[in-house]
């Protein structure tokens, strides 16, 4: 069962898939085509209220208003980077806050969404886990992040649309699986936002390997990324406490099951921490771990964005990163050093939210 997670009793209509919206409409005495009209208003015309749906009856609009809200998020802070990255801080109906990031890529507009308010995974280098999980983010609230970013461009008369989505914001997506899957089905719907499945990536730390197997059977063509960050259990446990319950042996058994079932590539995210996990010896361990799986593997080396609360960690030097990369390439591993975005704003995941919460507490003191 999903926990009671908002003070607003009406859910966001964005949380319904098209089939669920049709089912709701029929149950409420409306024809199927009326639900299709609502869907078109939501995702093609992208209206901001039910009253703008001009081909619906007043009675049907009243039904919609009684049952749903449209967009449950309120924009609190917007930070724009010199490189075009935009970071948003949104407030939810129960006054908790989440982050969303827009990144301009050579291939289009990519949005990084948040799936939980806070995080309990306990990664020692990450800003997201500084503030523990308060609740899950509903499917409607996740979709709303995309809609508000798109609104940002629509209002400016810019002919640009969100083309890619990465589920890599605050929280562990597979710890909010039901809402995650509804969100994915909504944004992937060909009659709506029509964001291609292969343009969507979901990242997990692997805290529940069984969820990776379940994801394989849900049979979406969505990309899977694994937050790996270390090639052995001892080092990974020191960085990610979830390794105690999900050691690499269990994690890779699930990953192997996923690739055998789907024949889809897995991306391994590896954050580069100076003096912790960035030596050539550790690079060789990573290569040995991935080598037999290399046909369906890709390693993403990520420059670390320092976090004030985690002063122990510093980003690897460019020289050490290059040496690490070279070891992987010499072993035939598919890899890349990730392009940085938003380095002149609160770039690390969770940083902006943490800073705003501290500011709010200071005002109340």
Curated annotation (Swiss-Prot):
Pfam families: Radical_SAM, RlmN_N
EC number of this enzyme: 2.1.1.192
Lineage of the organism: Bacteria, Bacillati, Bacillota, Bacilli, Lactobacillales
GO molecular function, one term: tRNA (adenine(37)-C2)-methyltransferase activity
Positions of S-adenosyl-L-methionine binding: 171-172, 203, 227-229, 305
Protein name: Probable dual-specificity RNA methyltransferase RlmN
Protein purpose: Specifically methylates position 2 of adenine 2503 in 23S rRNA and position 2 of adenine 37 in tRNAs.
Organism per entry: Lactococcus lactis subsp. cremoris (strain MG1363)
Disulfide-bond pairs as recorded: 112-349
Cofactor binding note from Swiss-Prot or TrEMBL: Binds 1 [4Fe-4S] cluster. The cluster is coordinated with 3 cysteines and an exchangeable S-adenosyl-L-methionine.
Span of domain Radical SAM core: 105-344
Anything else known: Reaction proceeds by a ping-pong mechanism involving intermediate methylation of a conserved cysteine residue.
Catalytic EC class: transferase
UniProt cross-references to InterPro entries, sorted A to Z: Aldolase_TIM, Methyltransferase_A, RlmN_N, RNA_MTrfase_RlmN, rRNA_lsu_MTrfase_RlmN/Cfr, rSAM
Cofactor: [4Fe-4S] cluster
Residues involved in [4Fe-4S] cluster binding: 119, 123, 126
Gene from which this protein is expressed: rlmN
GO biological process entries: rRNA base methylation; tRNA methylation
Protein family: Belongs to the radical SAM superfamily. RlmN family.
Highest rank taxon of the organism: Bacteria
UniProt KW keywords: 4Fe-4S, Cytoplasm, Disulfide bond, Iron, Iron-sulfur, Metal-binding, Methyltransferase, rRNA processing, S-adenosyl-L-methionine, Transferase, tRNA processing
Active site: 99 (proton acceptor), 349 (s-methylcysteine intermediate)
An annotated GO cellular component: cytoplasm
Location relative to the cell: Cytoplasm
Catalysis performed (reactions): adenosine(2503) in 23S rRNA + 2 reduced [2Fe-2S]-[ferredoxin] + 2 S-adenosyl-L-methionine = 2-methyladenosine(2503) in 23S rRNA + 5'-deoxyadenosine + L-methionine + 2 oxidized [2Fe-2S]-[ferredoxin] + S-adenosyl-L-homocysteine; adenosine(37) in tRNA + 2 reduced [2Fe-2S]-[ferredoxin] + 2 S-adenosyl-L-methionine = 2-methyladenosine(37) in tRNA + 5'-deoxyadenosine + L-methionine + 2 oxidized [2Fe-2S]-[ferredoxin] + S-adenosyl-L-homocysteine
């Amino acid at each position: 069962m999903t926990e009671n997670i908002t003070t607003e009793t009406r859910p966001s209509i964005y949380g319904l898939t098209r089939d669920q919206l049709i089912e709701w409409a029929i149950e409420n005495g409306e024809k199927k085509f009326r639900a299709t009209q609502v869907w078109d208003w939501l995702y093609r015309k992208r209206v901001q209220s039910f009253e703008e749906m001009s081909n619906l009856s007043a009675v049907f609009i009243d039904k919609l208003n009684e049952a749903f809200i449209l967009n449950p998020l309120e924009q609190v802070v917007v930070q724009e980077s010199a490189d075009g990255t935009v970071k948003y801080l949104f407030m939810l109906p129960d006054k908790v806050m989440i982050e969303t990031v827009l990144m301009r890529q050579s291939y289009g507009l990519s949005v990084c969404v948040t799936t939980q308010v806070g995080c309990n995974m306990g990664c020692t280098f990450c800003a997201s886990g500084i503030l523990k999980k308060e609740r899950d983010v509903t499917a409607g609230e996740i979709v709303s992040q995309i809609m508000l970013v798109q609104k940002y461009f629509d209002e400016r008369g810019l002919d640009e649309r969100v083309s890619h989505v990465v589920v890599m914001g605050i929280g562990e997506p597979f710890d909010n699986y039901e809402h995650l899957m509804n969100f994915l089905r909504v944004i992937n719907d060909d009659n709506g936002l029509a964001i291609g499945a292969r343009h969507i990536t979901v990242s997990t730390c692997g805290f529940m390997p069984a969820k990776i197997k379940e994801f394989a059977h849900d049979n979406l063509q969505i990309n899977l990324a694994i937050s790996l960050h270390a090639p052995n259990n001892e080092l990974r446990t020191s960085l990610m406490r979830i390794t105690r319950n999900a050691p690499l042996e269990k994690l890779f058994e699930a990953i192997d099951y996923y690739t055998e079932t789907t024949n889809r590539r897995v991306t391994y995210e590896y954050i580069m921490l100076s003096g912790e996990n960035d030596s050539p010896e550790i690079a060789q361990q990573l290569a040995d771990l991935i080598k037999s799986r290399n046909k369906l593997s890709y390693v993403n080396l990520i420059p670390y964005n320092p976090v004030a609360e985690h002063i122990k960690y510093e980003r690897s030097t460019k020289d050490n990163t290059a040496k690490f990369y070279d070891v992987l390439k010499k072993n035939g591993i598919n890899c890349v050093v990730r392009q940085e975005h938003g380095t002149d704003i609160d770039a690390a995941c969770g940083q902006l939210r943490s800073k705003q919460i501290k500011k709010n507490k200071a005002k109340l003191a």
